[in-house]
Amino acid sequence: MARSKSSAGWLKEHFDDYYVNKAKQDGWRSRAIYKLQEIDEKDQLFSKGMTVIDLGAAPGGWSQWTTHQTGDEGRVFALDILPVEPFAGVTFIQGDFQEDDVYQSLLDALDGREVDLVMSDMAPNMTGNKGVDIPRAMYLVELCVDLADQVLKPNGDLLMKVFQGEGYDQLLKSLREKYQKVLTRKPKASRPRSKEIYLLARGKKA
């Protein structure tokens, strides 16, 4: 079957992508590493010994950067519906975050451990229909917020990929009630055509 023009265009963009090539040269698992690196360098997300949850972790770039920044005493709990090649310092759970049993598996792995940072690079499979895509994306965001409500320690932080659209303003309002400040970030490594931004909610209120 011939590839569609859109999929062929995506492949060309992918292989011509500066950050894809840079990730290969630098030994990182994905171009997404540079989004997190830029946010980290601006906002100092990490410190040694932190406990971090990485949602939408595959193929593992964000977890790689996190273990690099948190050191041998840090712990990363990563989750994705796709497999991730294991590496030191990361506990990986494969499954759909929307499923109750997978969510519970993550809580079981934490074993009561309080979390310093919840981060999510999750996104649904996009159809191109905003009326479908935005609600699906917002549902994942809401699940991530619920998890942070449950496991983040006081003054903990939440970093999430979001897509602006219906429900975005209400999300901001809700986060501002729960956290000391909420920042928006658009890393240079985000593809220009992408509507994604990242919300960084800092300092969970007790």
From Swiss-Prot:
Primary site of residence: cytoplasm
UniProt GO MF annotations: rRNA (uridine-2'-O-)-methyltransferase activity
UniProtKB keywords: Cytoplasm, Methyltransferase, rRNA processing, S-adenosyl-L-methionine, Transferase
Known catalytic reactions: uridine(2552) in 23S rRNA + S-adenosyl-L-methionine = 2'-O-methyluridine(2552) in 23S rRNA + S-adenosyl-L-homocysteine + H(+)
Keyword Methyltransferase assigned: yes
CDD domains: AdoMet_MTases (cd02440)
Cited Gene3D superfamilies: Vaccinia Virus protein VP39 (3.40.50.150)
GO CC entries: cytoplasm
Top-level division of the source organism's lineage: Bacteria
Annotated EC: 2.1.1.166
Residues bound to S-adenosyl-L-methionine: 60, 62, 80, 96, 121
Active site: 161
One Pfam family recorded for the sequence: FtsJ
EC category name: transferase
Subcellular location: Cytoplasm
Function description: Specifically methylates the uridine in position 2552 of 23S rRNA at the 2'-O position of the ribose in the fully assembled 50S ribosomal subunit.
Assigned protein family: Belongs to the class I-like SAM-binding methyltransferase superfamily. RNA methyltransferase RlmE family.
Protein's recorded name: Ribosomal RNA large subunit methyltransferase E
Organism: Hydrogenovibrio crunogenus (strain DSM 25203 / XCL-2) (Thiomicrospira crunogena)
